[in-house]
């Protein structure tokens, strides 16, 4: 299994992975609309020269207070082809891509997802760090991971995703 940054020639396969994983086109459309925006990151899992997984990060904003300006990214989507799920591919994508986020100066990552799954990587309820989601979601499914200890100390407010998220919902 190889994890690497996406390449131009991967775009059709990435689209297919997202459609297969989510059984709809919304996530694939979202990725296409966000691709190329500053501070987006996209990685693929490749096995035998086939893309079997994909993870994408895009910038979010904090409408509130923070002692300093921070780069915060939103993890969405994470997709693995159904026949490759439950083999650790999503785990590998998350672990390696979070390292890349840190290398690029990102201080925290937010995600909307399963607490049972994402807590394995250190994600906690964003509410514990004074953050809430702009969408009406349960507190426990909106999570955050500080990539630098204490990065969110003194921060509070509403995390806002890019407009493309609403357009593709």
Language-model regions, residue ranges each:
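Conserved acetyl-CoA-binding loop-helix of GNAT-fold acetyltransferases
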Residues: 75, 80, 86-99, 110-111
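A conserved beta-turn-beta hairpin within the catalytic core of GNAT-like acetyltransferases
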Residues: 60-75, 85, 104
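Conserved glycine-rich acetyl-CoA-binding loop
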Residues: 50, 81-92, 104, 120-121
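Short hydrophobic/aromatic beta-strand or adjacent loop that forms the aromatic wall/cage
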Residues: 40, 138-143
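Short, solvent-exposed loop/turn elements at beta->coil junctions and helix N-caps
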Residues: 30-35, 129-133
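Conserved active-site alpha-helix within GNAT-family acetyltransferase domains
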Residues: 103-107, 112-138
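Short amphipathic alpha-helix that is part of the acyltransferase structural core
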Residues: 1-30, 37-52, 70-72, 149-150, ...
């Amino acid at each position: 299994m190889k994890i690497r940054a996406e390449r131009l020639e991967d775009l059709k396969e990435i689209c297919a992975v997202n459609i297969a994983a989510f059984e709809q086109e919304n996530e694939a459309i979202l990725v296409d609309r966000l691709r190329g925006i500053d501070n987006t990151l996209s990685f693929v899992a490749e096995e035998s020269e086939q893309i079997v997984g994909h993870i994408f990060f895009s910038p979010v904003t904090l409408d509130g207070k923070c002692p300093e300006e921070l780069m915060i990214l939103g993890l969405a989507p994470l997709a693995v082809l159904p026949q490759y799920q439950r083999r650790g591919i999503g785990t590998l994508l998350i672990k390696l891509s979070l390292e890349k986020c840190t290398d690029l100066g990102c201080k925290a990552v937010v995600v909307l997802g399963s607490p049972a799954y994402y807590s394995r990587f250190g994600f906690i309820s964003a509410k514990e760090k004074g953050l809430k989601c702009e969408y009406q979601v349960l507190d426990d499914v909106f999570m955050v991971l500080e990539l630098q200890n204490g990065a969110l100390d003194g921060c509070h407010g509403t995390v806002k995703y890019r407009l493309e998220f609403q357009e593709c919902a």
